[in-house]
Amino acid sequence: MVAVASQISCSHCGAPLPVQPGEILITCSYCGFTSVVETGKAFEFEHSLILNTLPPAQVFDSIKGWMKNSFVAPKDLSKKSSLIEQNLVYLPFWVVSGEATSHYKGIFERISPPEEKEGDITNHYDWMVLARTQTDFPTRSYHLSLEGKIPFEATKIEKGAKVLNSEMSAEDAVEHARDEISNLHQYLAKDKVDKIVDIKTNFEVSETSYLHAPVWFLTYAYKDKRYQVLLDGAIGQVIKGDLPGEDFKLI
């Protein structure tokens, strides 16, 4: 059975709000009020916005600069590529802040004889979790600064931009962050020991907040093929992009 979008009314201003299947939070595009889809009640967490700084006319110029600086892109890519489509999307993120501490025990095998070793890894994190379930967005490659965030205002969203809603609860986001941080600390521990015998990680959450951040989704063409690029709308840097390879020629 195909899931069908529904519609509810904003509990703050009464505007009609289309709800896509799977969305559990919805932000009104008229007044900026965020509510829980199931109950219609007000959202209890801080909701922030990172502003887009790139006018539409400058987006492809930023991509061309990235092309010119690439060591693997064809030399004529910036001149011969053409823009097919670009869309500004405000992606929803949960920001899970807190301190994580791991205690590890392992075997250090880089000396002879090998010796047992243990230690601690402690770091503070503002861990970003994309609040969408069916996506392969490279969140760990997205180095977003939270310094420029402001309280969410619908009037700050550009006309034509799309604001995606959350498909993930705060509780699920915390568990997701906890799992990813545990995996990160296990990776860091492997730099200290060659074989991990035991590792335990404790993540103390101090704050959970909700955030929308601007990302340009762009498609360009080169030699009859299409390629995708994701561009950070806040600072104009490429998050991830596809590049065509150089044609191989015999000398």
Per-region residue spans from a language model:
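Residues immediately within or flanking Cys/His clusters that coordinate Zn2+
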Residues: 5-7, 25
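Charged, low-complexity helical/coil segments in non-catalytic cytosolic or luminal regions
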Residues: 44-229, 241-251
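Cys/His-rich microdomains that often coordinate metals
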Residues: 17, 35
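A charge-rich, low-complexity, intrinsically flexible signal that marks solvent-exposed coils, linkers
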Residues: 231-233
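Short cysteine-rich clusters marking metal-coordination/redox-active sites
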Residues: 10-13, 28-31
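Short Cys/His-rich "knuckle" micro-motifs
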Residues: 20-23, 38-42
